[in-house]
A protein has these predicted regions:
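Conserved acidic residues
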Residues: 78-79, 104
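Conserved catalytic network of the ASCE P-loop NTPase/AAA+ motor domain
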Residues: 72-75, 98-100, 134-137
Length: 261
């Protein structure tokens, strides 16, 4: 009924991505986290690492970041971290949300067929991601997942510097010496084949190792040093309903995970 009233009265209206861009992003340095999986956790971690380093970033994402107790925050710093979704912007605007977000630094961690309700096939999704990459300015940065052939191929579309991350041997940002225990994951991050920082992460699984790598590459581009990255990751509390530990029952640890972590 509200929508019909707006249309009947010819009132001005805009999609949420348009409002975010026009009200917040023109004067910000936009950090866009995109890909089929891992967006929410990575965006939350990027915002937390920047906060730990004293940057006071803004954040908009699709889950509740435990460190902030919310899915959004408006900081006083110039950095704006935003989860970049390829889903359409509104019923009247079928372009992908992330095309509105003015990316200065963008991560594309992986790329698979998704959102079958609006995309006919993988080619249609590829097109939106190619458009995103082409929006990054020449002085910006694209960070792609080396373990995803589809994401890695996007480097050829970029007109800006490109870095890669993953467990693959050729990744610019690579995790090695990975060990997993009951309390989390430990590993060494190498940058261009050289030791960069040792990580103790409360997060579990290879996907979360990749999320940490992506976040590390992003905040390193903002000038955050290795010590703050290590301490920030160690104090990261994760995202609600993303591989969230609910406790133990009869010796079995229970986790809640809503969707892509």
């Amino acid at each position: 009924m509200e929508l019909e009233a707006v249309l009947d009265q010819k009132m001005a209206y805009a999609s949420l991505p348009e409002v975010v861009r026009n009200q917040f992003l023109w004067d910000s340095r936009s950090f866009v986290v995109a890909g089929t999986h891992g967006k929410t956790t990575t965006a939350a971690l990027v915002a937390w690492l920047l906060t730990y380093a004293g940057r006071d970033p803004s954040l908009l994402m699709g889950g509740v970041a435990k460190n902030f107790g919310a899915s959004h925050r408006l900081g006083r710093g110039r950095e704006f971290v935003i989860e970049g979704d390829e889903y359409d912007s509104a019923f009247f605007d079928k372009t992908a949300k992330f095309l509105k977000y003015l990316p200065d630094v963008a991560v594309v961690g992986n790329l698979e067929f998704d959102h079958a309700d609006i995309f006919d096939d993988l080619d249609a999704i590829r097109l939106e991601f190619r458009r995103l990459v082409r929006l990054i300015p020449g002085q910006g940065l694209l960070i792609v997942g080396a373990d995803s052939d589809e994401a890695f191929a996007l480097r050829d579309e970029a007109h800006c510097p490109v870095e890669s991350f993953g467990l693959s041997s050729g990744a610019d940002w690579k995790a090695v010496s990975i060990t997993t225990g009951e309390t989390g994951t430990k590993f060494l991050i190498e940058r261009d084949g050289e030791p960069f920082v040792r990580i103790t992460s409360p997060l579990l699984g290879d996907y979360n190792v990749r999320n940490v790598l992506a976040a590390t590459a992003m905040v390193a581009a903002a000038g955050v040093d290795a010590k703050d990255i290590a301490n920030g990751v160690a104090t990261f509390e994760g995202v609600k309903r993303r591989l969230e530990s609910l406790g133990e029952l009869h010796g079995v640890t229970l986790y809640l995970s809503l969707i892509h972590i």
